[in-house]
Regions:
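Non-transmembrane, aqueous-exposed alpha-helical and coiled segments at domain scale
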Residues: 1-423
């Protein structure tokens, strides 16, 4: 680790890898943990001191009282959901107001944004993207069109600004003939959330971060979702509305590219995807169901079944390339403990043509597999890589060779103690 750098921790396939747990493990190394993109559409699950927490907006370094946590300008925030999340943490004994700063430049998700999200999705009919309905897309639309509200707006003339934007939303909804909704109670909770947010330091976080870096402090940028959900580099249009790749760290926190240090790419030992969109490695058989059951593959925010499949090296290598990944972290290795053999996708095939490069559109491409022996060993009690069965060592070595990137951490269970740092 180099002092005065921002290390990025990124999901590098479709998200849901377990970034929250790794941030929790990494936090002692860093002075600041910052989220740079996304909103309450992605939940990071952490088991801390025996209790399960799902963090949707708040950085995962919040459990360490000696660390500053930052919600950066690239994020979008729903005040009501933020308040509910924060209250749960406060009731568990964590002092958030001394540990969390929020960028004044982050955009606000209004109750009507969530209605617009549902309305836009309904209008697509069969071509639904599979949105979480949290209002993320409509909020980023207004950010790009320069009509949104930001956190800093709650400090001055906010009621007038809010009512003006709400009226605009109501007109759009009327034009879409989407009028069967009542947000009265939701709006009340939202306004209470705004008042609660005023109790936190609402700051120019880009200035804070750059000053901290100049003082030699270390920052961990906590990614949300994954590379294949990036608005530019993902499986468009079945993507999120923000830049989830390493470039988003710079724009979402206001730091220069030369401030980036290590780029940690986190992935599962197999593949999952939530929602609609192409997924060449998806398994529709009992194997896919078994992976889902053993891995508890259900969305942390929506509860939706995750689609499951074998590891996709085409997607993994593409993500390593666009992010400049320097180290890999393999999660949920223990989920594959019971399999006699494990398949790995090495290429895609369509109309008799094979490719190892990520196509512009992955719809209709089928996975080409290579099969490796399984390890048939319970990994969950292991505490060092010396205990790894040879088949797992071979699996790790195979991935490292194919990706030309070292796997420096292997997770063998959900608890922070079940995280093995390789020598």
């Amino acid at each position: 680790m180099t002092k005065g750098k921002v290390d990025a921790l990124l999901g590098i396939v479709f998200g849901d890898e377990g970034k929250g747990k790794v941030v929790d493990v990494f936090t002692p190394r860093y002075d600041i943990v910052a989220r740079f993109a996304g909103g309450p559409n992605a939940g990071h699950t952490i088991i801390f001191e025996g209790k399960k927490f799902v963090l949707r907006s708040i950085p995962s370094g919040i459990f360490d009282e000696g660390k500053l946590n930052i919600i950066g300008n690239g994020c979008v925030i729903a005040p009501d959901l933020f308040a509910a999340e924060a209250h749960e943490l406060e009731s568990a004994g964590y002092d958030l107001k001394s540990r969390l700063h929020i960028s004044k430049r982050a955009h606000l998700i209004l109750p009507t944004h969530r209605v617009l999200d549902r309305a836009y999705e309904a209008a697509k009919g069969k071509n639904k993207v599979g949105t979480t309905g949290k209002g993320i897309g409509p909020t980023y639309i207004e950010k790009a069109s320069r009509t949104g509200l930001r956190v800093g707006d709650i400090l001055n003339d906010f009621p007038q600004k809010y009512e003006a934007l709400k009226a605009r939303h109501m007109q759009i909804l009327e034009d879409l003939h989407f009028t069967d909704f009542d947000i009265t109670e939701e709006e009340k909770r939202w306004m209470e959330g705004v008042e609660y947010m005023r109790q936190f330091p609402l700051t120019d976080t880009e200035i804070e971060l750059n000053k901290a870096l100049s003082e030699g402090k270390n920052v961990l940028a906590e990614g949300a979702q994954g590379t294949m959900l990036d608005i530019d580099h993902g499986t468009y249009p079945f993507v999120s509305s923000s830049n989830t790749v390493c470039g988003g760290v710079c724009t979402g926190l206001g730091i220069a590219p030369n401030r980036i240090g290590e780029v940690y790419g986190i992935f599962k030992a197999y593949s999952t995807r939530v929602g609609a969109g192409p997924f060449p490695v998806e398994l529709f058989d009992k194997t896919g169901d078994l992976i889902r059951e053993i891995g508890h593959e259900y969305g942390a925010v929506t509860g939706r079944n995750r689609r499951c499949g074998w590891l996709d090296l085409v997607a993994l290598k593409y993500a390593i390339m666009v992010n400049g990944v320097t180290q890999l972290i393999m999660m949920k290795s223990d989920v594959l403990d019971g399999f006699d053999s494990i398949s790995v996708c090495t290429a895609y095939e369509k109309d008799g043509v094979q490719t190892t490069d990520m196509p512009y559109d992955t719809e209709g491409w089928k996975a080409v597999y290579e099969t490796l022996p399984g390890w048939k060993t319970n990994l969950t009690q292991m505490t060092s890589e010396e205990e790894f069965p040879q088949q797992l060592r071979d699996y790790i070595a195979y991935i490292e060779k194919e990706t030309s990137t070292p796997i420096t951490i292997v997770s063998v269970g959900p608890d922070r103690a079940q995280t093995i740092i390789r020598k």
